[in-house]
From Swiss-Prot:
Keywords: DNA integration, DNA recombination, DNA-binding, Plasmid. It comes from the Bacteria. Residues 130-151 are annotated as: Disordered. Residues 165-184 bind DNA. The gene is res. This is Resolvase. The lineage of its organism: Bacteria, Bacillati, Bacillota, Clostridia, Eubacteriales. A likely role for the res protein would be to stabilize pCP13 by reducing the number of plasmid multimers resulting from homologous recombination. PROSITE patterns: RECOMBINASES_1, RECOMBINASES_2, RECOMBINASES_3. Belongs to the site-specific recombinase resolvase family.
Amino acid sequence: MLVGYARVSTEGQSLNRQIDMLVDYGLDKRNIYQEKISGTKLRRDQLDKMIEELQEGDTVIITDLTRISRSTKDLLNIIDRIKEKGASIKSLKDTWLDTSGDNPYNSFLLTVMSGLSQLERDLISQRTKEGLRSAKARGRNGGRPSKRNDKADTVGLLYREGYKIVDIVKQTELSRATVYRILKDLNLK
């Protein structure tokens, strides 16, 4: 069975052009899942419902790649989910995307896209690690600043003077857990 997916990014946009293309291709309008949501959103209810309802041998038809995904990684994940159901996907505009047959050219392009996606993830990871090392070398450890820096001495002083934890919490406006953590760091608890 042919199953269609049409998506626009905002409520103000119309799905009519995509639906017309899918119907012209031979889809029954009742088999077209429609969505008005940004492609960058990972949770797309109609897309998820369509994939869930796919049967072995079904083919998902889209007008073009940007309607189903905004990133290579997301596209590859969606294609994998469709293939796991025993179905295939075909794009009307991006004719290289057709997993319904054993076309070596299409398989090659998907493999290249997968490799590029992995390369992108690896480069991001490498840049992140380099940035963290560079920041550490400049004396920056990352994370949010500790509240302890401002009020640790006050907490220690009040505790040594016999104040109860509840009173220290009120005076310093720190949480109970933070007060206990400071006392532990100061070897007072």
